[in-house]
Amino acid sequence: DKPFFTFPTLASNCASCTAISVIYNADGTFKEYAYLKAPALHTFINTKIIAESPEKLFWAGIGDALSKEYEVVFACRDKGMTHTPLLGRVLAEACTKPLVSYGKKALEDCRNNVSSKNIEQIALDIIITTGLVSNFTVHQNNPDPKDDYYYNSSLAHCVYYGASLFPKCEHDHLHGEIVSFGVLCLLTYDEQFEERQRIFEFNHSIGLPCTLGEIALTEEDVPAIAHKAASVVEWTYVPGEPSEEKFIKAILDTDKAGKEFLAKRI
């Protein structure tokens, strides 16, 4: 119950600003979430330290933050939301634009260990904006289960949790890297094809994946990914009637579209 503070030395995710912890099994597969009573009282960010952190982890942080707007807006659809989750939904819409505007230059600055406005804007987006959205859009383990909600993540993270079943992917590819491919799968599932094209362009511009092969997965792995997805809390908040078959098709269609996209860039 004591107040605590966080001092993130990486901008690889929003963990330092949230009241959510992810628990994994000993083999690296996703197990469950742990919900804290409150997030840190204050999060201190030193952009010089972030600029000197490993570029690959900063890059993965961009991929993770990329999911926030799309997942929250998708998960909230057609839900009768009260003030707090509604505030989170509105704030989520501020997550993608900074990544597209500053992300590529921020990566260059991180590569050169230069503290800059680009680094600052991306670090704030990855750690603070997405972290606040997480805090506003999750309310679990209430005395009355009808008061529970979980809009913080959705199908993009479902791809990640399914991918964690495969050591060839989970051991060699970072969380945000895999999630960024999941964003494309969500957009396919939701038939947002114009937006998917924009994210293909963005991912490709900074080296994030556009296909299964780039994260060491194959078409044969997809049914197991979808089956794992159907077991996590995010699945219960997919709009309409979530379907493993539809999700399998969305992942395969994304992979096909990604291959076609990359072929045109050769």
Where are these regions (language model features)?
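Active-site segments that bind and position negatively charged phosphate/pyrophosphate groups
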Residues: 81-202
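Intrinsically disordered or highly flexible coil/loop and linker segments, enriched in small
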Residues: 75, 79, 108, 112, ...
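A glycine/threonine-rich phosphate-anchoring loop and its flanking beta-alpha core
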Residues: 2-95
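C-terminal charged capping/lid subdomain of soluble metabolic enzymes
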Residues: 192-266
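A short secondary-structure junction motif
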Residues: 69, 73-77, 106, 129, ...
